[in-house]
Amino acid sequence: MNIYSLFVVAIALSLDAFGVALSIGLDSCVKRKNKLLFAISFGFFQFLCTFIGAYSGFLFNTYITYVPQIIGGMIIAFVGAFMIKEGFDNKEEKLLLNFKMYFVLGISVSIDAAVVGFTMFNKISSNYVILGDSVFIGIVTLILSIIAFIISRYLKRIQLVCKYADYIGGIILVIFGLKMMFF
């Protein structure tokens, strides 16, 4: 696979992480450190899932085509529903700031990378090429997640967005989850 094709695949895979990062970034309780940890989590799990998928793709390719998207979509929609609920509750403790969420969201936005690894990278014979391609995808996801957090910082300056950030972020996550499950 040439670098252009790999870059297009990396962008496509990282769009879910971009949308989730944008939604998380709208929450005023999420600090810079949390945003960086989410971006690292998204990039790492994108790399890891692609890498694992490439090695196990030939075994599971026929059986697991739609299941990861449904599971990932359900998790993201579930987190979105909790964000909307937290908007109504106005609690100080946020679900997003729970340490487990770095893993839950990181894995849920990266499940499709495992499917890509199953289908596209399972025919690559060199372990170094698989590792390099997987690292590249992880780095692109990390960078796009950081860009999403930067964009969300400017979106929060809009009074309407700031006032309804939990609801907007939650609705976006629910929509992303539904998109992953059904489209």
Curated annotation (Swiss-Prot):
Major subcellular location class: membrane
GO molecular function, one term: manganese ion transmembrane transporter activity
Entry annotated with the keyword Hydrolase: no
UniProt topology in membrane: Multi-pass membrane protein
Membrane spanning stretches: 6-26, 36-56, 64-84, 101-121, 130-150, 158-178
Compartments, as annotated in UniProt: Cell membrane
GO cellular component term of the entry, any: plasma membrane
Entry keyword set: Cell membrane, Ion transport, Manganese, Membrane, Transmembrane, Transmembrane helix, Transport
InterPro entries (alphabetical): Mntp/YtaF, Put_MntP
Superkingdom of origin: Bacteria
Pfam families xref list: Mntp
Family: Belongs to the MntP (TC 9.B.29) family.
Its job: Probably functions as a manganese efflux pump.
The name this protein goes by in its record: Putative manganese efflux pump MntP
